[in-house]
From Swiss-Prot:
Residues 454-467, 1081-1095, 1169-1184 have a biased composition (Polar residues). Residues 437-446 have a biased composition (Basic and acidic residues). It comes from Proteus mirabilis. Keywords: Cell outer membrane, Cytolysis, Hemolysis, Membrane, Signal, Toxin, Virulence. The gene is hpmA. Its main location: membrane. Bacterial hemolysins are exotoxins that attack blood cell membranes and cause cell rupture by mechanisms not clearly defined. This is Hemolysin.
Amino acid sequence: MKSKNFKLSPSGRLAASLAIIFVSLNAYGNGIVPDAGHQGPDVSAVNGGTQVINIVTPNNEGISHNQYQDFNVGKPGAVFNNALEAGQSQLAGHLNANSNLNGQAASLILNEVVSRNPSFLLGQQEVFGIAAEYVLSNPNGITCDGCGFINTSRSSLVVGNPLFENGQLKGYSTLNNTNLLSLGKNGLNTTGLLDLIAPRIDSRGKITAAEISAFTGQNTFSQHFDILSSQKPVSALDSYFFGSMQSGRIRIINTAEGSGVKLAGKFTADNDLSVKADNIQTDSQVRYDSYDKDGSENYQNYRGGITVNNSGSSQTLTKTELKGKNITLVASSHNQIKASDLMGDDITLQGADLTIDGKQLQQKETDIDNRWFYSWKYDVTKEKEQIQQIGSQIDAKNNATLTATKGDVTLDAAKINAGNNLAINANKDIHINGLVEKESRSENGNKRNHTSRLESGSWSNSHQTETLKASELTAGKDLGLDAQGSITAQGAKLHANENVLVNAKDNINLNVQKTNNDKTVTDNHVMWGGIGGGQNKNNNNQQQVSHATQLTADGQLLLAADNNVNITGSQVKGNQGAFVKTTQGDVVIDNALSETISKIDERTGTAFNITKSSHKNETNKQTSTGSELISDAQLTVVSGNDVNVIGSLIKSADKLGIHSLGDINVKSAQQVTKIDDEKTSLAITGHAKEVEDKQYSAGFHITHTTNKNTSTETEQANSTISGANVDLQANKDVTFAGSDLKTTAGNASITGDNVAFVSTENKKQTDNTDTTISGGFSYTGGVDKVGSKADFQYDKQHTQTEVTKNRGSQTEVAGDLTITANKDLLHEGASHHVEGRYQESGENIQHLAVNDSETSKTDSLNVGIDVGVNLDYSGVTKPVKKAIEDGVNTTKPGNNTDLTKKVTARDAIANLANLSNLETPNVGVEVGIKGGGSQQSQTDSQAVSTSINAGKIDIDSNNKLHDQGTHYQSTQEGISLTANTHTSEATLDKHQTTFHETKGGGQIGVSTKTGSDITVAIKGEGQTTDNALMETKAKGSQFTSNGDISINVGENAHYEGAQFDAQKGKTVINAGGDLTLAQATDTHSESQSNVNGSANLKVGTTPESKDYGGGFNAGTTHHSKEQTTAKVGTITGSQGIELNAGHNLTLQGTHLSSEQDIALNATNKVDLQSASSEHTEKGNNLSGGVQAGFGKKMTDDASSVNGLGSAQFAIGKQDEKSVSREGGTINNSGNLTINGNSVHLQGAQVNSKDTQLTSQSGDIEITSAQSTDYKNNWGTDIGFNGKKTNNTPKEVTEEKPATSIHNIGGKLLVNVEDQQKTSHQNATLETGTLTINSNKDLTLSGANVTADSVTGNVGGSLNIASQKESDRHVTVGVNVGYNHTNDPKSSQVNKTAKAGGSLLEKTIKDTIDSGIKSSTDAISDKYNSLSSTIADKTGISDETKAKIDQGFGKVGNGIKNIVTGAEGHTANADIKVTHVDNDAVTKTTSLTSNNDLSLNVNGSTKLTGAEIVSQQGQVDLGGSSVKLENIEGHHYEAGADLDLKSSVVDLAKQLVGGDISFKSPVKTNETVNTKASISEK
C-alpha cells in the first residue's frame, strides 16, 4: 500500500496544534491508570489531587514491577507508597503502610506503561517510606516539564521497554524505537542520580541531579543502565540539550550512528562532564529584536511633507557554557564547538573532524529624514550595520587536548588557554584562522532647489571597516601541533611559556589574514539648474590590512614538516632556541603584500555647467610586511630542498645555521606603487582697454589644458640574515639579491656550488603628457582703424622618465667572512665590511659593477594659426584731425592773430575744404601659421662598484678573476689575490643627450585700397636642428692596503686605470704571462647640425604699376667633436714595488712611487708606453640665397621700368685632429731595476737613487712621447647685388632725355687655415749610479739621462739622437669688395654741394674742385717719395718703376674722375697671409754623468744632434767608433697684411696721410743647427 504525505495549510496546522493540546490535557486528566492485570498497583487520590500508588509486591530482588495504562503526573504530584509503616508524606500528608509489601520494601520501583499512551510528568514524584530507585519505562514517549523526584536514590526515565527473562529484570531496550524524551522549560529536579534513556532527547529546561546520565539511540541496557548493544537507526536520532544541567557528574551518550547531540545552555558538573555521540555540536542561542518608529512631525499634503522614520534590528547571544573538572566531548564524526565557552581542569575534544568556531551577530539601524515643500526637497537616509563575531573560548587549568581522528581540526576565532600543555592533533590538516568583523556606515541623499544657491542633485557616503578577531592559543607549559596533513595558521597568535612543537607530514603554513577597509564619497549636484555651474565627485579608497601570525615560545621552538615550511608576513620566535626542518620540501620565509587602492573622479562646472576643471586619479600601492624568524639563543634551519628568504628577517642572538640540500636564496621583496592621474582645466579671459591714442581693443581667450601622468615605482624591501655567528651551507647555490648578512660577535661562512651577491633595482617610471588647446578673438576700433583677429594654438608635450637605483647586497661581519664556491662566485655592486679576514675562493670570481641610471625623453608639438582683417583709414582721419586742431590753435594766446576772433563752423569747413593730402583707406587680410616639434632625450648612468673592506683580504680563484672598478681596502694587514688570469676593467659613468627640432611657419597677406589694386605677400621659413652629446668618465679599480699588496696570476693580468696603494707595505704583482697596466679613457663626443630655408613672394598691381619680387635662402651646417682623455694607473708601495711578468710587462702612462726599491721584470719585453689622448673636430657649412624683383610704372608724363637682384653663397669646412701623448713617472728613494729581454721607455719621467737597466737578449730604447696637431680648415663667402632703372619721358627732349641707371656690386671672403705640427716630450732619467746592460743596441731618442756615474755594457750599437719638432702653419684671409654705378647723384662733389642747397651749390662745387687739384698734387708727391723708398729697399729696376708710375698715374686720374663725376668703380680689399714653417730640435738629447761615464760598446756609437757629457770625469765607450752628425733645422715665419679702404676717396686720404707702408713680408727666416758632441773634463 502506498503512503501519501499531506501538507497542511496554516489553518490546518493551527487545528492540529489545538487537537494535540486537548489530547494532552485529556491525558493529564486521566492521571495514573493502572493496568487491570495482576501487575497493576492500587491507585488512589488524596486531597489536592495528589495520587498515591501502593506499589505491587516486590520480587525476591526487591523489584516492584508496576504496569499502567496511563502514567501522567500533574502538578500536585504522585506518591509511591514503599512504607512498611504509616508516616507523613511530603506531598500527600499522612499515609498508612503499603499492605502489598508483605514486610519487604522495594529497592527498585519499576513503572511500566503497557498501553500506547505517552507519559506527561508535570509535578513531583515521591517514594514514601523507604527510599528506592525509580524507573519509568514508557516506549511511547515521556514529557517532563517541572517534574522531580523525592526520596529516590536513583531516578530513571526510559523511553523503552523493560527486558525480563524468566521473570527476572535483565535490563531495558530502546531498539526499534524513535520516540522522544522531552524535558520542558520548567526542567527536572532531583537529589539523587538521574538517568535519561531514550532514542531521542529534547531538553529545554534546567536539569539538576547528583549525577546525570543521558543515553540516546537504539540500545539495550543492563539493569543498571550499562549499554549492552546498539543498532543503527533508519533515520537520524538527534538529541537536543538546549536548557541547562547542574550535577556532580554529567554523561551524555548518543549511540545512534549518523545522529548527534546538540548542546545549548549552561552545563555545570562538579566532576566529569562527558559527551559522546556520532556528531556533537555546542551552539549558543541568538535573540532577535527589532523596532520601527515614525517621527512625531510626519505629514503629507499637496504642498509638502515630512517623513521621519527610525528602524533597526539587533541580535544578542547567550553563550553556551560547559564547566566541569574534566570535560570530554568525543564524536565519532563531526565535533563542533560554536560560540561556546568550556572551562575545566582537563579538557578533551575529539571528533573525526573538530571545529571550534564562532557565531555572527548582526545589528542594523536606519534613519530616514525626507522633507519637501513645493519645489524644494531634501531627503537623507543614514544606515549603520555591524557584524560581530562571537568566538569560542576554552580554558583548561591543566591540559587541553584537541584531536581530529579522521579529518581536520579547524579553529576560527577560538581562544584556547591551557595552564599546562595544549595539544592539537589531526589525522589530516589543522586550520587556525580568525573571523572578520565589519562595521559599515552610509548616508544617501538627494536634494532639489536647496539653499540660496538652488542646489539640486544627490550624494552618497559610505565607510566600511573590517577588524580581525584572531584565534589565540596559549599554553602555560608546552604547545604542540601535530598533523598528518598540513598546518595552516592565518593571523593567529600562538604562545607557550615553555616549548612549541609544530609537526606536519605535509606543509606548515604561517600566513597573514587580510581585512579590507572601504570608503566611498559621491556628490553630484548643480546650482540654478546648471546655469550656476555644478560639481561631480566619485571618490573611493580601499585599504587592505595584513594581520600577521605570531608563534612564540619562551622556551624552545620546533617547526618540522616533510614538505614545505612557509612563513609569510608573520613572526616566529623561540627565546631559548629555534629549529626549523623540512625533510624534502622548501623553507620559505616570505613577505606579505597589502594593497591600497584610491580613486578620485572629480569635476567642477562653471556657467551652464561647462567643465571648468576635472581630476581623475587611481593610485595602487603595495606595502610589504616581512616575516621574522628570531631566536634569542641558537637558531638552525635545515631544508630538504631550497631555503628562500624574501623581504624578511632571520635573526639569532647566538649561532645561526642554515643548511640546504638545494639552494639558499636571500632576496629582497618588491612593493609597487602605480599612479594614473589626469587633470583638465578650462580658463576664459577677456579684455577691454585702450591700446593707443583713441584706439581700443576688446576680446576674449579660451585655454583648455590637460595633464596626464602615469607612474610606476618599484621599491625593494631587503632581507637580512643576522646572528652572533652565521653558517650558510647549500648543496647547490647561495644567492643574496639586494639583501644583507650580519654577524654581531663572530664569524660568517658561506658555502655552495655557486655563490652570488647581486643587486636589485629600485625603479621609478613616469609618463607625462601636457596638452594645451587655446583660441581667441579680439576686435580693435578707433579713429585710425578697425579690425579683428582670431587665433588658435595647439601645444603638446610628452615626457617619459625612468630612474633606477641599485640596492646592492651587503655584509657586516664582526669577525671573519669566508665564502667558498665549488664553481663560480659573483658580486654585482656588493658591499662587504668585515672586521677580520675576508676570504673567498672559487673556480671563477667576478667583482662586477652595476649602474644607477636616469633617463628622460621629451617629445613636443606646437601648431598656431592667426587670421586678421583690418581697415586702416588713418590717411583720412589724421589730416582731418590736424586741420581742425590747426584752426583751434590760431585762437590760442601767443599766436599772431586777433584774440577776439573765434573759430566758426564755416572756418572749420573752409580748412577741411582745402585739404589735398587725403589717402584712400586700406583693407587687408593676413593669415599666419607656425608650427614645430622636438624630441629631446637624456641618459645618465653612474657605476656602483663592488667594495671589499676588511682587516685582511684573501682572494683565491682557480681560473678567472674579473674586476670592474672594484674597491679593495684592507685596514689591518694585506691584500692577497691569486688567480689563473686577472682582468680589472674601469667602470664608466655616462652622460648622453640628444635633441632634434623641426619648426617652420608661413604668412600670407592680401590688401587693397581702391578695389582695383591688390597686393599679395607670401613668406615662409623652416629649420631643422639636431644636437647630440655623449660623455663617459672612467674609474679604475682601487687596491688600498695597510700592509702588502700581493697579486699572483698564473697567466695574463690586465689592469685598466687601476690604483694600487700599499700604505705600509710592498706592492708585488706576479703574472705568468703578460702583465699590462693600461690607461683608462674618458670620452667626449658631440655633434650639431642645422638645416634651414626661407622663401618669399610679393605681387602688387594697380592700374598704373606692376611690382613683382621674391627669393629664397637655404643653408646647412654640421659640426662634430670627439675627445678622449687618458686616465692612467698609479702604483705606490712604501716598502717597494715589484712587477714580474712571465712574458711582456706593459705600463701605459703609469705612475710608480715608492720610498724603497722598484723592480720591473719581464721574461720578454718591458714596455713603458706613454698615455694617449685625442681631440678631433670636424665641420662643414653650405648656404646660399637669391632675391629678385621687377617693377613697372606708368604716369601721364613718363614710364619707368626697374629691376633688382642679389645672390649669396657660402661654403666652409673644418677638419682638426690632435694627439697628445704623455709618459709615465717613476719616483722612488731606493733603487730602480728594469730587467727584460728588451726594454722600452717612452716619454717616461724617472727619478731614483740608483738605476739598473738590463736587456737579456734585445735592445734598450729610451724615446720621447710624440704629440701631433693637424688642421685643414677653409671657408668661402661670395655675394652679388645689382639694380637697374630705365626712365622714359612721354616726350623725349634734350632737357628730358631717357635715362638708364644701374648699381652693381659684389664681395668675396676667403679663410684658409692649414697646420701640421709635431712635438715631443723627452724622456728623463735622473739617478745616482746608472748601470746599463744591453744585449744588443742602446738607443736614446728624445731623452735626457742624468746620473752621478754611468757604467755598463752595450752588446750592439749606441745610438743617441735628438728629435725635431715641426710646425707648418698657413693662414690666409681675404676680404674683397667691388661696386659700380653710373648714377650722377653718386658724385662725391655733387653729394657735398647739394647738401648746401640750390643757392650755394655752384660755390661749394668750385671750392671742392680746387681742393681736389691740390690733393692730387699732394698724392703725386707722396707717391714719388714713397716709390723711391720702396725701389731702394727692394731693388726694383727703373723700367719696373716706370711701369708702376704709369699705373699710379692712371689710378690718380681715375680717382679724380670718380670724385668729380659719377662714383663709378669702388673697391676694398683686406688681405692677411701668415706662413710659419719650423723644423728644428728644441730639446737636445743628452747622456750626462757627473763623474765617469764608462760604457763598453761592442758596436759603433752614433750621435745625431745629441750630447754625451761627463762633467767631472772621463767618457769611456770601450773603444767604440764614434760618428757625430749634426741636425739641420730652420725657423721660418712670413706674413702679408694689405688693407685698402672701400672707396677711392678713402684711399686718397690714406695716400695723403702716409698710412700705407710697405714692409718686408719675411719676419723670421733662420737656420737652426743642433750639433752632436762628446765632452768630458
